[in-house]
Amino acid sequence: MVTDFIYDGLRLSDFGYAVVSFDGSRGGEVDTDSQLSYNHVSMMSGKRQPYITSTYDDPLKMEIQIGKNVCTADKSESMFNISVEDMEFLKRWLVRPHPHKLSVVGDDYLGFYWMGSFNVTEHVFGDGRIGATLEFECDAPFGYKDDVVVYGDLNADETFRYNCLSDEIGWIYPDITITVKEDGDLQIKNSDGRVTEIKNCRANEVITIDKNLQISSSSASHKIADDFNYVFYRVNNSFNSVVNTLNTNLAISYEIRYSPYAKVVIV
């Protein structure tokens, strides 16, 4: 059972709270876990309904209940009650207009995190606030694994192989930084057959392509937007193969960074 978490770099237990369960079952409940919706087309009077597309309609949602940690509570006050000021702080910390990183303390969740924000519902008993239910809504239908970084040097027409560690079949746009070591038109290939091409590169030029599909160059004179074919390099993952390749026609140094999807929930 989860007892502690870290949100936006701040740890719950440092403020005197712990993950609890008000109904005696568990501290976290999963509302949605990577549920796909399948779109069909009806054929043969409905006797066949093959899939046309599939989509994730909703983000992952999880519920955590918190209360005062009675082992560390100030014994001069009610050990269970949360003051108005403390509840204000909790809401200021947890309820944000933009997503932040949530990670759970414990070996079972080592290397996993989620991005999102909370809504807070107070629990009142008698005249005091005894805790809160935190409803966490992610920015995706699943969580993430810690960033994977691969880097090194490639000679012209040399190939580097690495594995995609994502739980989700498909592809991910990574952050990729390339230092070109010779003049020329750069071509970047993966095993999926896509070719990323950037023309008129110069030796020692640093090219950056991020996961939000933005490209930039360290060379102010290189009009890279005009020389890029807008085929972005992707990290691929199929059920039968997780192997990716990096192949370039020019000598380069490279760094590829991506966040694998993790189909893991807090329980």
Residue ranges and their predicted role:
Residues K47-M79, G128-F142:
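Oligomerization/assembly interface segments of phage tail-like spikes and tubes
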Residues I66-V70, V120-E122, C138-F142, V180-E182, ...:
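Beta-strand elements of well-folded, non-transmembrane domains
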Residues G67-M115:
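Short, acidic/charged, Gly/Pro-enriched secondary-structure junctions
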